[in-house]
Amino acid sequence: MQAKKRYFILLSAGSCLALLFYFGGLQFRASRSHSRREEHSGRNGLHHPSPDHFWPRFPDALRPFVPWDQLENEDSSVHISPRQKRDANSSIYKGKKCRMESCFDFTLCKKNGFKVYVYPQQKGEKIAESYQNILAAIEGSRFYTSDPSQACLFVLSLDTLDRDQLSPQYVHNLRSKVQSLHLWNNGRNHLIFNLYSGTWPDYTEDVGFDIGQAMLAKASISTENFRPNFDVSIPLFSKDHPRTGGERGFLKFNTIPPLRKYMLVFKGKRYLTGIGSDTRNALYHVHNGEDVVLLTTCKHGKDWQKHKDSRCDRDNTEYEKYDYREMLHNATFCLVPRGRRLGSFRFLEALQAACVPVMLSNGWELPFSEVINWNQAAVIGDERLLLQIPSTIRSIHQDKILALRQQTQFLWEAYFSSVEKIVLTTLEIIQDRIFKHISRNSLIWNKHPGGLFVLPQYSSYLGDFPYYYANLGLKPPSKFTAVIHAVTPLVSQSQPVLKLLVAAAKSQYCAQIIVLWNCDKPLPAKHRWPATAVPVIVIEGESKVMSSRFLPYDNIITDAVLSLDEDTVLSTTEVDFAFTVWQSFPERIVGYPARSHFWDNSKERWGYTSKWTNDYSMVLTGAAIYHKYYHYLYSHYLPASLKNMVDQLANCEDILMNFLVSAVTKLPPIKVTQKKQYKETMMGQTSRASRWADPDHFAQRQSCMNTFASWFGYMPLIHSQMRLDPVLFKDQVSILRKKYRDIERL
């Protein structure tokens, strides 16, 4: 055996050597013949070898450096590999590689902050209503500037929403019109809005002109063409989508278990051929006519009968049996398959209806995906796994379904219910990219009240806002600052403002008192103010207008603010109790004087009433506690037009603050126990008696209500019948057993 192994090894080694000499000889002969040919051609003057003749030759020589955005403009002398050509042609945008760092000029934003300029409308140019709403939302926002030299971002007045050449809204010659703009600068620092692009039959994402280095806020954009941290994916919305406000979500109360009549529904067009037809043509395989109702119709377009298949008549009959709105209101999940384009109107319809969207649109970059975690509000499916959808959603636990439905309502109302919210969300995302050091985190974007109402310029710490105490495991503040608004001169030591100051200072929760002196008379001398155990700071209002009481003064060192009118009559016990209530509801207004609103059918407008009833929707800031963040929000979020109106009327600032807080929280204020004589005492004071009795004052407040509701786009105030009283309040027990016993004695 050992001898056989040795013979086998020797035979293998010999074979290897033979092969080596054979192939080596071929290469040697080839090189010799090649050298002879070179020598022969050299004698005939046909070849002059270079000094690096003996260096090896590589198939692709190193190319000189060329900036990426100049590759397509170079002549053919610069070699571009086939792979690079494919990459360049794979995108419809020449600025495929654009990112904020490479195609955005940050220096324009450092000087004046984030300001947006809208080009003036050119004469003779038609603008669709949807694009007019977008421009109006920008011009009505706090970001707008009419001075291009102050702008950080530029938006075209040319309508770029519909770039389908078959659409009547299509704007012709857009390429030359855009290039002629003197501020265009190859699209740098420009934002282009687009809902529809491409046309039959392939519906590409080409917008029909060179966008250069401009950002796209685009619906139905694919992940392939989406430029991360540069473009913004927006939802597809209809021309009827409201400009401001918008309807609230359909989830009025939480039903347990959170299941509805239908498990999964869809009702829409079916395309027999072409792009987007595969998924919708296959839906009938999943439809069972019971809890999974997926309805399609071929009955659309001019020539639908010429192209209909064997299922069309049956599908059309079944389609007519069901009401779409009824299905939405009674379904747990709503299928959102792609159409001709990746996006669909069904997406926003499902969100509003609290019907959990089941996405079937492979490659779609979901709206605002940069900041929204869609796994908390939707089920992301795969078109190739359509038949597995029913079993997948049936396996979702009821607790998860309830959480998904609740999140759909939050996202709808925070970012999608109006064109204004879609536009503002787009702008806020871009602003966060520019000022990364104060940008919002994922918790802010995906938790109530959302990114539009939490301004990072106020603070980068979540604990400074009234909405995140529970998330951070923090207790609400234990101290407050009393801010007394003084408008009448100090002529007597018995004036109500001095009694109020002493009562507030005696509170165990009071950290300091600030007197905002908005009186035309000079400041009183320091000895005129009573001595207190807490600091008393007197601030003279520079403008002496009503809105100045809500300025974010640096002197306010506590998160809680006790806002007081100079003629308010409160005891220390009442102040203490109101503050302990506020600690349980730090995001709301908590206080004493309550008012209400109503809809006047005869006048078709909102009405204001001060009648004492069991129903209220406002707590006036003449005696109320709230978080100081609302001072900042009032000053920086609300438009100057509303604040100017308040200042001119010297009225309605308390109503506007209630509008703001209710719009943010989606909750009513909280009324606490009030002494019986409060109304009579307050009305008897000389400083404001004339105001409350003045019919013009009341008419102004009626007018304010409607102006404010018009700007918000809806009525944010919410009615409530809850009043919080101390434990054992009015109970037939000994007064000594009651903590806030003085309230009943008043």
Curated annotation (Swiss-Prot):
Pfam families: Exostosin_GT47, Glyco_transf_64. Residues 1-7 are cytoplasmic. Residues 29-746 are lumenal. Keywords: Disulfide bond, Endoplasmic reticulum, Glycoprotein, Glycosyltransferase, Golgi apparatus, Manganese, Membrane, Metal-binding, Signal-anchor, Transferase, Transmembrane, Transmembrane helix. Disulfide bonds join C98-C103, C109-C152, C298-C312, C334-C355, C652-C704. Its EC number is 2.4.1.225. InterPro entries: Exostosin (IPR004263), Exostosin_GT47 (IPR040911), GT64_dom (IPR015338), Nucleotide-diphossugar_trans (IPR029044). Coiled coil: none annotated. GO terms for cellular component: catalytic complex; endoplasmic reticulum; endoplasmic reticulum membrane; Golgi apparatus; Golgi membrane. Pathway: Protein modification; protein glycosylation. One of its GO terms (molecular function) is N-acetylglucosaminyl-proteoglycan 4-beta-glucuronosyltransferase activity. Its main location: Golgi. The chain crosses the membrane at residues 8-28. A protein binds at L166, Y203, H300. PANTHER family: ACETYLGLUCOSAMINYLTRANSFERASE (PTHR48261), EXOSTOSIN GLYCOSYLTRANSFERASE 1 (PTHR48261:SF3). Glycosyltransferase forming with EXT2 the heterodimeric heparan sulfate polymerase which catalyzes the elongation of the heparan sulfate glycan backbone. Glycan backbone extension consists in the alternating transfer of (1->4)-beta-D-GlcA and (1->4)-alpha-D-GlcNAc residues from their respective UDP-sugar donors. Belongs to the glycosyltransferase 47 family. This is Exostosin-1. It comes from Papio anubis. The gene is EXT1.
